[in-house]
Amino acid sequence: MTSDNDMASWNERADRFCKAWSSEVGRPDFDTLSKVYAADPDVVIYDTLPPIEGFRGFEQMRQAIYPQLTYIHVRRTGPIDVKRLADGTVVVTSYPFHLSYGFSDGTGHEIEARISEVWEKRSGEYVIVHEHPSTVYAVAPTGKA
């Protein structure tokens, strides 16, 4: 990876993040992800699926996320936007991605979404201190205007 100010390094970081979330065995690569998320229990992590209140800290997410998950694929589908704040010690990124989930009951989701992440530089490395994906699910028409 090149300089933290180099867009290529942020593209690489986002792609490694997506790869760590992808799995054929139902569990993301939590060892890699534990180095990406700040260890603080007050880090707020939202997801595209419940719980709506999100997770407080990486460990809570790791223990509770998708117990019936059989596979997950995450792929960045567009350019990353990078906004540096606080002399570069805080960076906000966002990018579109495609997400495929499969569950043990045979259901699944194909989602086009955008993720926003707040990264903070700690001990020379950027870690996620807040994450929020957003998407729109297809909703069946209600017949009401």
Task: Name each region found by the language model.
Residues 94-102:
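Generic short beta-strand segments
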Residues 1-8, 85, 104, 121-123, ...:
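Short S/T/G/P-rich N-terminal loop/turn motif that feeds into the first structured element of a domain
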